[in-house]
Swiss-Prot record:
Motif D/ECD-tripeptide: where in chain: 72-74
One Gene Ontology term, aspect cellular component: extracellular region
SUPFAM superfamilies: Blood coagulation inhibitor (disintegrin)
UniProt-listed Gene3D superfamilies: 3.40.1620.60, Disintegrin domain
Name of the protein this chain belongs to: Snake venom metalloproteinase HT-1
Amino acid sequence: LGTDIISPPVCGNELLEVGEECDCGFPRNCRDPCCDATTCKLHSWVECESGECCGQCKFTSAGNECRPARSECDIAESCTGQSADCPMDDFHRNGQPCLNNFGYCYNGNCPILYHQCYALFGSNVYEAEDSCFERNQKGDDDGYCRKENGEKIPCAPEDVKCGRLYCKDNSPGPNDSCKTFNSNEDDHKEMVLPGTKCADGKVCSNGHCVDVASAY
């Protein structure tokens, strides 16, 4: 019967092997302050080696910010002093008003039509007039609210702001007052994002404009 020959671990070869907690090379070359290069074990005082809340082999002090808030709907996370990891990402409750009541919080963001138009087309592009969104009642390539089994479902009159996204191009020269985004890869980009404010006290949910209190 053949047998596998397993070489004994060699401390100092910069390979983490069985029985070693670390291996940073020979003592004169070691650049890892957490590792005892003579034993290939972590120093007894080491609390961590890496992580957003780890510095110089110790847990970062409690209260040090490790993940800044990305919007007014997000919550900044701080180290606990007991772990090398930043706490799980948390955010303000869905439906909380944001951006001076222009929107409502949704999963840490504040989705509004203007920001969606800007993200797709850049500067000088804004939310289109209400008349453009009326096209979403047609239920065709130009305008619809959602897809069911590949079929484009028209919007009810009260849901038109929750279908296809329409933007207004204010660039100099001839421009499109009912500009839409066309994507062969991701038709979700063509649509108003979930959680977007569609009327006072209402947000978009699955192609419907519903009361914010019942949406979440």
